Amino acid sequence: VQLTFDADVEAFRAEFVGFLTEHLPTQAQAAERPSSTSHVPEWSRRWQRLQFDHGWLLPGNPPEFGGRNANILQQFVHREELSRRRIYHCFNPQGVGIIAASLLSFGTEEQKRRWAVPILRADKTASLGMSEPGAGSDLAGLRTKAELVGDEFVVNGQKVWTSGAHDADVILTFVRTDPNAPRHKGISALLIPTDSPGLVRRPFPSVYDRDELDFNEVFFNDVRVPADNLVGPLNGGWRVANGSLGHERTLMWMAFANRLEQLLEDYRPSDEVNADHYATIVMDYYALRLLGSAALGKAASGDVDVAALSVLKVFGSEAEQSALRHALDAAGADGLRDKMLTAPYNPYAPDLFTASWFARYISSYAGTIAGGTSEIQRNIIAQRVLGLPSR
């Protein structure tokens, strides 16, 4: 199912499809996703640089930063074509889509030159340091502290669930710089190079792929960071965190919708009971598309509805989890043994049996946790949509 837009947006889509037709490498189509940013094949770096040079890496960026000043609807059709065709986009999506975006919005010209451009051109990789023990979905509860001493910050504390930190050149780290300020107002954002003395990274496996080390604990022991690495104003980290994720959240629902669409294409039950389950997935898919297109329309007019995005996050992540549960039930024991348990998890795989429904089902639980748990999102919905008290 493809939404149709005005002629200028569809012309933008056609231009991007033409670029893909001419330049897309076969490896990106075959979805040979690199398993780690430290073992990235050269074709992947070349493909990312080619997109940067042609303005297709992040079309919403200015041309000097790999884009073409595209509006939100044009960015939508760009993302839609990538997802619908199951195309490998870039090897460091967090660095490209969040850290570099943060620097373009809040960074200095020197920070953009030193960090944003190399990240976008695949010369450097970046990770995001938010979650901490005891402050997973609650950024305002973070305790990692940074004290300004002369022209340096001295950082002490710990982060956890830091994706890709073991391979990253820099971590955009959120720290507490004013312990006496209200929780949301004493936070700052720092660019901390991973080769800084006192910074220790400890990768650990996830339940859905124990051979791939992606998550990390990161420890800061008197790590000295130049004051010039402050992103945005001192104690203004809350605004940096929310601003850098703004458009990403607006388009996040597409990932859930496209994975549901892939499931509908690959899962075709023949019996009546599972046909009912299939119908439920179809209804969830269309409901998600309608909710998402409504939020997209608001964003196009400059109105980013945070509560509506929370609804999309909860509904999309839980609909995907439910759909995969139905698919596993339909496959039965033989399907689990013969076709699913042996396949590695690969979200870009050309079909869901290759991707392993079982591995994808396990990983779907991360979708209800990462980026703010369903419980946190329901609190936002209760307070901002329903007007309920916080206690």
Task: Report each predicted region and the residues it spans.
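Amphipathic, small/basic residue-rich leader segments at the start of a protein or domain
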Residues: 1-91, 114, 118, 271, ...
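Glycine-rich phosphate/cofactor-binding loops in nucleotide/flavin-utilizing enzymes
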Residues: 2, 73, 77-78, 98, ...
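Extended amphipathic alpha-helical segments enriched in small hydrophobics
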Residues: 9, 16, 251-326
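Internal helix-loop-helix
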Residues: 48, 52-123, 164-170, 248, ...
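A short, Trp-centered hydrophobic/proline-enriched beta-strand micro-motif
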Residues: 122-130, 174
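A structural signal for short hydrophobic beta-strand segments in well-ordered beta-sheet cores
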Residues: 144-147
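A short core secondary-structure module
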Residues: 152, 156-202
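Glycine-rich beta->alpha junctions and the first turn(s) of the following alpha-helix
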Residues: 200-290, 367
